[in-house]
């Protein structure tokens, strides 16, 4: 979106059959064939080695074509020859080519077609269940999962349900709601709780940061859920029914803007076990590209400590993201700004030694101070009402939740940046 690059989708037919096997493996021959047993020379779907051998074959192919594997993500390869820039991202047999020109895209496709049997999908419109919509004249790209979401609603009989405006119910999910007896467990055993949570988890990972907190709460009870937990899962589906056309909208940003904007936040001891919830958001091209809602591993003794741990959690993702973008050719000369709404935390990241209330924190959390000193990141204060990571730390009221949907550019319809639909 930032550079108006070409997006092209390729599919490798019977990908696993391309990988030669290193182990000696035999199979029973089909009936009617003379030899009773066959030795496998290449992989088959279902073999434990098949996926690994396919990756090694693909890696050798890219290496022979002068591509470089990104150490930050081994599924991404880059190739810069002359003025042509090619980035290839692979998930099993799906390949997404990102190039700076159609000529470079055609060259990369032809080179891969000489090695494998490939279906050329043209301009990328679908990838791993995500719909990609582009308005190239306006430098706008939208990613959504509306069709996948509709299938989820149909599967669980919620396609025409009454909708809700927030993903979380009014009640908090507690262990007291878990079944107390074998009869209670048998009553809820047939409920599709795990299936709902698993499918919603994929949504929250790909395109829907607004449901990350709700999914995380539901996932805590996957092995021991009760009726109220299931009601909360259906509440989430009712919210998704209302917002099913929403997706992340990216657009070109002014050159004066930094490539990344990051936000970290935390509640404080609001959960049942008094462990706080960390949330972070990393934005690029105006919308989130990475986010997380995660319960902290220890009980924070103050809100400052809880926010400090949240910032440390975010810092690790920032460092990885900067490294990945650098390997893809988008180097960041300036430190990435991390916004936090706790002034004490901001002060601690710049001078941790002068704060006695932080001396007991485990050493891993002080990694953020090292990154500040190395100028990889720079932590700044932001008012809590302007911190979108708040969405990932606790249930919010309708008005505040809707505000963050707009702020994160989770838009409905055709993805018009200027006219956002607010639930």
Predicted feature residues:
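Metal/cofactor- and membrane transport-associated sequence elements
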Residues: 1-117
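C-terminal reverse transcriptase regions that engage the nucleic-acid substrate
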Residues: 121-248, 383, 391-393
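RNase H-like nuclease fold core
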Residues: 200, 262-304
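RNase H-like nuclease module associated with reverse transcription
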Residues: 131, 221, 258-259, 294-423
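Active-site palm subdomain of RNA-directed nucleic acid polymerases
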Residues: 56-97, 104-106, 115-124, 203-214, ...
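Mobile genetic element proteins and their domesticated derivatives, centered on retroelements
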Residues: 11, 27, 46, 58, ...
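Reverse-transcriptase-like RNA-dependent polymerase core
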Residues: 13-38, 56, 80-81, 160-177, ...
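Structured nucleic-acid-interacting core domains from mobile-element enzymes and related host factors
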Residues: 1-5, 238-264, 330
